[in-house]
Amino acid sequence: MLTFTSRWCVVCLTPAAAALALAGAMAQQPVPTAPAAAPAVPPTWAQGRKPEQESLNLAPHPPGITALAPEEIPLDRIKLPEGFRIAVWASGLPNARSMTFGRNGTLFVGTRFVGSVYAVVDKGTAREVKTLLKGLHRPNGLAFKNGALYVAEVSRILRYDSIESRLDSPPEPVVVFDALPKDEAHGWKFMTLGPDGWLYFQIGSPGNILIPPVTHAQIARVDPERGVLETVVSGVRNSVGMDFHPVTRELWFTNNGRDWMGEDVPNDTLHRVTHKGMNFGFPFCHQGDLLDDEFGKGRSCQEFDAPALKLGPHVAPLGMRFYTGRQFPAEYRNNIFIAEHGSWNRTRKQGFNVSRVVLDGDGRPVKYEPFATGFLQAETFWGRPVDVQVAPDGALLVSDDVAGAIYRISYGK
Amino acid sequence: MQRGPILRVFVAARLAVLAAAVIQGHPAMGADAAAGKAKSEACAACHGPDGNSTNPLIPSLAGQTPLYIYYQLVQFREQRRVNELMSPFAAKLTDADMKDIAAYYSGQKAAEPALPADDPRYEAGKAVVAGNHCGSCHLPTLTGQQQIPRIAGLQYDYLVKQLRGFKTGERPDIDGSMASAAQPLSDKDITDVSLYLAGLR
């Protein structure tokens, strides 16, 4: 997996090679010229772990690869503000992750660990769940444009034309772009369609904390008509959620901070992109004001652009959307909802919520609060929010990759 | 250097503590090991009645982490891990069946492995484990955690086949960690480390 396709990558370093080069430079020694094989690196999640942290027994939670039956989903544990309620909208979707709506109302749901893409068809009182695509390589990123479903795997973007009329016999995909890095580490994509018609997604850092190749740790975009790829912003460790402000059309995104620097640092963050070419600091500066304890030496956070909001340490903010519906009270209009998958690199768990961010007239966050809580009960979680999506009727859908379900949060009646 | 009996007892005790913690700690373990024993009759022909396989290419399940057994059964059922022997069995199992079977086998005692006698590859295999950070996920005892399998004491031939499979991509893995980890391994590394692991309890 440590190989790169170099169609657009000019300076390609594998993570192993980058680590080797770095280690060589730090030791003031020449880099070995012809190693028998690339040296092994620790698994992504363990990179940067200090020896004294091993006894904490912290490791990423097992992925959800099955689905709970609807009657097994303890939604009575969920707490919401007054007037809101939550119900199971669809179940039986193992590892349900990113969501996007088709023009005719089909909800498409991607996965990270099971290779499938689901299509959920609303039949009024019930939903029909179809396994639309199988055997894909981490099809976590989805977008819909001109009747076609776009699917981002780790290294390719695929297009399925006229998909909503072919849910039972999807066509062979057209490969739109196939030259993205193949790293497994932070290699799965979140993808969304920009108002400019380009597909936006992240290329994550190929490790917890390292000097990334110039091809990585960024938000990128592809013009699906021409197959052109561009960097939008850099210094982004791994974003698994983004959306465009409905009024300003600026890109906003969530970012997952590094692990093993501490229980309470760094914060995960919410970012506002005011212009192309911004650099948000990874791996030198985290959360806009905290130098990395290793890579920050000799650097300053002033060199970089700051996040719009700190979200808390290790909360794992994934999908985010602006609330553009009309069902919720007026004060929710153009708020940001964020699905927080929840922490693993922290002895007391944090996150496991859907949270709400209120912006003022200048687009500055003025309030950040939990919106849907209760996935975590006394340090044990039964579900993990992954993505949020505003339904055509103004309800908020939430995907859960542990329960394998989609919930609907509605207001009134 | 061969391990003395004291170290072996220490390792076994630590393993038991870890296994207990893992079983109690996971929500999957509303499972019923007694029911799992009854449901595992078909498994016993190949994996052994107590989960200690005598077939070099069929893995022992005794003392395996319950979540690993459960996840692999799901993978077989969903055809994401394909094996002509396993797939038909897994196809018939519900999630609850799989959790019960996993609970049963994880609670069985792993048989004493046949230790290699002064095999020079033993130390080489130990160095492969250290140099490739196997203990990061499989734990320093190599007894696994959560969905990460116990690899200590598995059969040599089975380990070699799986590691070669991870390297070529023939053996899929859920999150890609093993595909990445197997890339730097030479075939000698694979046989050395398999020999070392097969001798661990």
Task: Report the location of each language-model feature.
Chain A
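Beta-propeller domain segments
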Residues: 32-81, 188, 206-208, 214-217, ...
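Short loop/turn segments immediately following the C-termini of beta-strands
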Residues: 112, 154-156, 162, 204-206, ...
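Conserved beta-propeller blade signature
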Residues: 106-110, 148-151, 198-202, 250-254, ...
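Hydrophobic core register within WD40 beta-propeller blades
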Residues: 99, 142, 191, 239-242, ...
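Asp-box/WD-like beta-propeller blade repeats and closely related beta-sheet repeat scaffolds
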Residues: 129, 138, 143, 155-194, ...
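Structural WD40 beta-propeller signal
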Residues: 92, 102, 145, 194-196, ...
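Blade-level signature of beta-propeller repeat domains, shared across WD40, Kelch, NHL, RCC1
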Residues: 389-413
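Surface loop/turn motifs at the tips and blade-to-blade linkers of beta-strand repeat domains
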Residues: 88-93, 130-135, 176-183, 231-235, ...
